[in-house]
Amino acid sequence: MLSKVFSLQDILEHIHDGQTIMFGDWHGQFAADEIIDGMLEKGVKDIKAIAVSAGYPGQGVGKLIVAHRVSSIVTTHIGLNPEALKQMLAGELAVEFVPQGTWAERVRCGGAGLGGVLTPTGVGTSVEEGKQKLVIDGKEYLLELPLHADVALVKATKADTAGNLYFRMN
């Protein structure tokens, strides 16, 4: 079997300008910082990020936002990163806000190859703008489309040659 363990340099060869990158951290905690630092050093830009939040300015995707390397982000909030708010208000960072449970379901749908998820969350609010609404048994739902990425970054404590990842404390 071909090993699924790669060097940092090998990984960075697969990361390019303009890609959609999913960040598997929690507000910058448990971020794949070595890879993110390598992306900064390589000069990767125009990243379309999918992340639970914009993180803190010095952690995770937050580092890339501060360096103006992220052009858009699909996220649940940006409140921990003042630079993200500044860039959003200046029109430098496109932000799609998604309720956290809906965000998680959209990520899951993308990974499972599903066409989307129906949710009542956001019906009757600005969240429904531009989305398909369905009525099932008299109840309104929004169709939320899956999130897909070219690359997903996760930090694991250990990995084996088959690609299995092991995480600290779980």
Give, region by region, the residue ranges found by the protein language model.
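Conserved alpha/beta enzyme-core scaffold
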Residues: M1-N170
